[in-house]
Amino acid sequence: MEEFKGYFEFDRVRQQNFLYPLFFRESIYVLAYDHGLNKLNRNRSIFLENADYDKKYSLLIVKRLILRMYEQNHLIIPTKDLNHNPFFGQSNLFYYQKISVLFAVIVEIPFSLRLVSSFEGKQLQKSYNLKSIHSIFPFLEDKLLHFNYVLEVRIPYPIHLEILVQTLRYRVKDASSLHFFRFCLYEYCNYKNFDIQKKSILNPRFFFFLYNSHVCEYESLFFFLRKRSSHLRSTSSEVLFERILFYGKIQHLVKVFVNNFPSTLGFLKDPLIHYVRYHGKCILATKDRPLLMNKWKYYFVNLWQSYFFVWLQSQKVNINQLSKDTLEFLGYLSSLQLNPLVVRSQMLKNVFLIETVRIKFDTKIPISSIIGSLAKEKFCNVLGHPVSKSSWTDSSDSEIRERFVRICRNLSHYYSGSSKKKNLYRIKYILRLCCVKTLARKHKSTVRAFLKRLGSGLLEEFLTGEGKIISLIFPRSYYASKRLYRNRIWYLDLLYFNDLVNHE
């Protein structure tokens, strides 16, 4: 960011909050579509003259787009006439896709500048292990043992586009950019009526920015009320801008609670609440207070309806008791398992038995969901019986084995934290036999004859990678014991979901 600061005049943008002129600068387009900087967009760059043959950037397309934006006065076009606007006709979806990427990059500039300025002069502790997906499970294992009730909320999406514009208006005070942002959103909705593929106009970075802005606004309000009880608040919570009518709406929510719960308003100050957000859901955990969970359920419904004007159905807010119900959390079925124990105690000459209960944080594999995902990808049928992967028979034998080993290794690493490994062994069995059937089909042979000719070397490849990693972590004596296969292992290098793991 410092490298391009003088070239793009970010200081001037920061002082005046004028982002709209950046849409007319060719250098910003180069920055937006640079493969080294734009890591969120895994697709090919669309700033190519011919994406199939020539992979050089074309500034000619950028100049054409800038000229079109100069010629069109889109700020005065009514919403009802957007379908007749020649600026983004059906034949010009190419230009809209470029503008959606550019808009996400430009609007991120003030956030990046404010984030850098807030961390200046501060020494931040680097905790790379906390970036792992598995890092949350040791926290839950330590905290949820003392909590009984969990409130699970599915974060609703805003129905009307003006809600997204209003959310962004609290942070971007450039009227021209906001009008242009509104115009792009309505154009995208109008394109849904055309007979085109959704992937042709979908830009991940643009919609990630919209979703994160929506969630950031919700969490900033929630953390403002519950910052003392939130143990997982974001480190960038200091980067919050002022909001229009923010405190007025806070007072409105307080009045709602005072009128409905005049004598029990103190639950807002309860410190024994933990908050976790994942995959469009959030959970709140508390101890021995079902009434508190019911109040928070009522609170969430009023929060979304009063502040965000979004109708939140009560069915999307579930109260679960961990000792009886299971919680679907990041691909695991989590619950609290109560194991009764009888302890023999002796005091002087008297011997007596003490009955106690041991609480264990249990994590299981959702085997039915994973088999459904494997069946969808043609690795097995709906009953879990392996079948050959016919679409891979054109590849070489080494490439086929490498694909199956990679998938098996990813699933094995992710679900290594399961309390019971029986379902994990079943998944490995499906992938191994599917690999053998695929190779046998390619060579026009039977499974028995192919295994007899190849030997046991094929099946050993599925265990080599996992065995090397585990042997580096644990001593050889412990690695050779059976306890390793019964205990849970959390890997702190998992930064993203595998496609087959993310089966929601």
UniProtKB/Swiss-Prot annotation:
Molecular function as annotated in GO: RNA binding
Protein family according to the UniProt entry: Belongs to the intron maturase 2 family. MatK subfamily.
Protein name from the UniProt record: Maturase K
Functional description taken from the UniProt entry: Usually encoded in the trnK tRNA gene intron. Probably assists in splicing its own and other chloroplast group II introns.
Annotated InterPro entries: Domain_X (IPR024937), Maturase_MatK (IPR002866), Maturase_MatK_N (IPR024942)
HAMAP family: MatK
Organism: Aethionema grandiflorum (Persian stone-cress)
A Pfam short name: Intron_maturas2
